[in-house]
Structures are given as C-alpha cells and as structure tokens.
C-alpha cells in the first residue's frame, strides 16, 4: 500500500544475488512470509485471494499474505517478539546483553511510533502492538533480557554440570 516502504524490491535483489533471506512474522503480511503461503491462506483471515470477506483493502484483491518468500521463516505470536528473540539469541552468542534493547527503549519506540500515526493491528491508535499493551511489551523485553543475563552467568557452570551429575551417581 502507499503506507509502506517498497522494501520487497531489496528482498528480491538479495534473492537474485543468492543472499539468504530471513523473515519474522505473525499474520503473513510481513515481507518473506509468502514462503508459507499455503499455511497462511488456510488459517489466517483475509489471506486468501479473491473472496470479498477475505481480501486485503489495498485494491489488489490478492489477500494480505506477502508475495515475497524467504528462505527461512520464524513465526511468532507477535512478530516484534520474534525479532526480540533473535536479538536475544545473538546477544547470548556474543555474550553482550547491551545488544538488546531495554524496556524503557521499548516504551519510547512504541510511544514515538504511535505519536506519528502507527496503528495497532486492530486499527487503533494506542500504545500497543498486536493488542498487547505497554506493560506486556515492556515485561517481554525485560524477561528476555533477564533470560540472556542469567544464561550468560551460567556459561562456565554448564560446561561441567553433567559431569558432576554422573559423578554423584545419577544416570549411571
């Protein structure tokens, strides 16, 4: 639609150059989610082409499912959360929680986006993402940061934990 950047052209260029592509989505309208089109059209309202009750509103009559197909797809209840999970995994692998954003940053981003007209999936101008209010959004970010921080604190312990368990006679 006219509201969105035409970033799918970049996606197509990456595929032409054999650069692996990756998509994160929740409803199938996210770039790259066309890779699982059959599943999306079966389970997601408005994804199918043609039928009046199930088409997108841009005028193409093609349904909301993205045209582009990624090589790898990650689905999440809230696509933002899938993105945060990928960032959390990278932060763990790099040993640096500063690679993740904070609950305060989440609040600022959502507030700023809302101030400039971002609507929720329900069409509401609210401080929420996919129906999840600010307290939930901030809690998810906080929980992911805590999980990574905790896991990083156990890296050395986990190198030998199973040895100690066997030494004590378990699983023997």
PLM-predicted stretches and their roles:
Residues 77-80, 96-172:
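C-terminal accessory domains and tails appended to enzymatic cores
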Residues 1-12:
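Active-site glycine-rich loop that binds ribose-phosphate moieties when present
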Residues 10-15, 90:
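Hydrophobic, Leu/Ile/Phe/Ala-enriched alpha-helical segments that form helix-helix packing faces
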Residues 23-25, 29-41:
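Glycine-rich, charge-decorated loop segments at or immediately adjacent to ligand/cofactor-binding or catalytic sites
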Residues 42-106:
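A conserved mid-domain beta-alpha-beta active-site/ligand-binding segment of alpha/beta enzyme cores
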Residues 1, 15, 43:
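Phosphate-rich cofactor/ligand-interacting catalytic cores and adjacent structured alpha/beta frameworks
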Residues 15-21:
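A short helix->loop->beta-strand "cap" motif at the edges of active sites that frequently abuts
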């Amino acid at each position: 639609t006219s509201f969105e950047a035409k970033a799918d052209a970049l996606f197509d260029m990456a595929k032409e150059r054999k650069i692996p592509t990756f998509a994160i989505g929740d409803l199938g309208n996210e770039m790259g989610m066309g890779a699982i089109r059959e599943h999306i059209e079966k389970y997601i309202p408005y994804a199918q082409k043609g039928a009046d009750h199930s088409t997108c509103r841009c005028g193409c009559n093609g349904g909301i499912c993205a045209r582009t197909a990624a090589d790898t797809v990650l689905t999440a209840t809230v696509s933002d959360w899938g993105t945060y999970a990928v960032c959390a995994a990278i932060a763990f692998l790099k040993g640096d929680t500063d690679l993740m954003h904070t609950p305060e940053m989440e609040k600022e981003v959502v507030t700023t986006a809302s101030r400039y007209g971002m609507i929720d999936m329900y069409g509401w101008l609210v401080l929420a993402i996919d129906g999840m209010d600010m307290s939930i959004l901030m809690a998810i970010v906080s929980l992911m940061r805590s999980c990574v921080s905790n896991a990083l604190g156990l890296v050395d312990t986990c190198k030998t934990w199973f040895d100690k368990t066997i030494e004590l006679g378990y699983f023997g």
